[in-house]
Amino acid sequence: MDEAGVAGWVTSDELAEAGRFVREGRRREYLTWRAVVRRELGADVRIAYDAAGAPVVDRDGVYVGVSHCRGRVAVCLSDVPCAVDIEPETRDFSRAAPRYMSPSELALSGDPLLPAAVWCAKEALYKYARRPG
């Protein structure tokens, strides 16, 4: 979503906060996920963070999960706790995979996308549990 797309969906405080990010891509990701949440829940929704750093909204019974990476964002909204993680298909996990995948997980498939899928699944579980990943 470009700046025109987020206009009207983000607050002046959020624009100021985004202005502090060094990378333009990170700035866009930050503003985009907030605009998506407000587009779905209403322009007046307040977005904050809980003690674990997870996003929360001021709507009873509404949970939000967010991930952003390399210019893309994913947002999940649910009536139960939720979490999401995304990574680009082009990211090479081959060297890191043995640190977060068990030998039996590594043996499951020769699919080169499996390490990315496992990474995202485990990262989403850490987010869901409100634990640092």
Protein language model annotation of sequence segments:
Residues 1-133:
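Core catalytic alpha/beta fold that binds nucleotide/phospho-ligands
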